[in-house]
Amino acid sequence: MRKVTLTLSAIALALSLNGAAMAKVHMPEVVSPGVTVTELAHQQPIKWVSVAEIEKSLEGQAPMAVGFDIDDTVLFSSPGFYRGKLEYSPNDFSYLKNPEFWEKMNNEWDKFSMPKQVGIDLVQMHLKRGDTVYFITGRTQTKTETVTKYVQEGLNIPADKMQPVIFAGDQPGANNKVSWMRDHKLKIYYGDADADIAAADELNIRGIRILRAANSSYQPLPKAGQFGEEVVINSEY
């Protein structure tokens, strides 16, 4: 009986000490509603799609021609654009009209660009299907370029499967990508910009949005999914 009494006393003491300790735990002042992991997982009501789901949607279809934008779609190329702005027009965006900048960007500064994982995954998926992959960029064309080289190396594209990068250029009031997309009979086009989705819509082909990284030099960020297009999940990197 004495052992039982001592045991119960020990338990009671432990509980009382634990309660006292709990009562003394300091908690900071609550200053915001906070968020749970479940709440973080809630997405906007748009058409999210994964690479695997895109691949599944193409099952049974013959090989086709597909296209990709480059900057912020398959390459994070902001380092070069950031450098160009600082060097040629720190107070505005006139550097984008400067031929000297484009000579640098198209021939040297892509060595600082990082391939996006979503670009690698999508391109490899299409190559596995036997699709022909084209890259159409809004960059200004230059006499020479190494963009094709860096895209091929960064996305692990075999030399015999790599098409030369198409430089559509950027003219106010015109979407220069449309004619190239039409000429190459694209069935799908991936891009981060509203103009990419608009070009696909104009040709009535499947336009799929890639998320632009939040730290991209190309601001403001577009509203992905606003046109009802599919948006690739986790495609910001």
Swiss-Prot record:
<keyword id="KW-0460">Magnesium</keyword>
<feature type="active site" description="Proton donor">
    <location>
        <position position="71"/>
    </location>
</feature>
<comment type="subunit">
    <text>Homotetramer.</text>
</comment>
<comment type="similarity">
    <text>Belongs to the class B bacterial acid phosphatase family.</text>
</comment>
<dbReference type="InterPro" id="IPR023214">
    <property type="entry name" value="HAD_sf"/>
</dbReference>
<dbReference type="GO" id="GO:0046872">
    <property type="term" value="F:metal ion binding"/>
</dbReference>
<keyword id="KW-0574">Periplasm</keyword>
<dbReference type="InterPro" id="IPR036412">
    <property type="entry name" value="HAD-like_sf"/>
</dbReference>
<protein>
    <recommendedName>
        <fullName>Class B acid phosphatase</fullName>
        <ecNumber>3.1.3.2</ecNumber>
    </recommendedName>
</protein>
<dbReference type="InterPro" id="IPR005519">
    <property type="entry name" value="Acid_phosphat_B-like"/>
</dbReference>
<dbReference type="GO" id="GO:0030288">
    <property type="term" value="C:outer membrane-bounded periplasmic space"/>
</dbReference>
<feature type="signal peptide">
    <location>
        <begin position="1"/>
        <end position="23"/>
    </location>
</feature>
<feature type="binding site">
    <location>
        <position position="192"/>
    </location>
    <ligand>
        <name>Mg(2+)</name>
    </ligand>
</feature>
<keyword id="KW-0378">Hydrolase</keyword>
<keyword id="KW-0732">Signal</keyword>
<feature type="binding site">
    <location>
        <position position="69"/>
    </location>
    <ligand>
        <name>Mg(2+)</name>
    </ligand>
</feature>
<dbReference type="GO" id="GO:0003993">
    <property type="term" value="F:acid phosphatase activity"/>
</dbReference>
<feature type="binding site">
    <location>
        <begin position="137"/>
        <end position="138"/>
    </location>
    <ligand>
        <name>substrate</name>
    </ligand>
</feature>
<dbReference type="Pfam" id="PF03767">
    <property type="entry name" value="Acid_phosphat_B"/>
</dbReference>
<feature type="active site" description="Nucleophile">
    <location>
        <position position="69"/>
    </location>
</feature>
<feature type="binding site">
    <location>
        <position position="177"/>
    </location>
    <ligand>
        <name>substrate</name>
    </ligand>
</feature>
<feature type="binding site">
    <location>
        <position position="71"/>
    </location>
    <ligand>
        <name>Mg(2+)</name>
    </ligand>
</feature>
<dbReference type="InterPro" id="IPR010025">
    <property type="entry name" value="HAD-SF_ppase_IIIB_AphA"/>
</dbReference>
<keyword id="KW-0479">Metal-binding</keyword>
<comment type="function">
    <text>Dephosphorylates several organic phosphate monoesters. Also has a phosphotransferase activity catalyzing the transfer of low-energy phosphate groups from organic phosphate monoesters to free hydroxyl groups of various organic compounds.</text>
</comment>
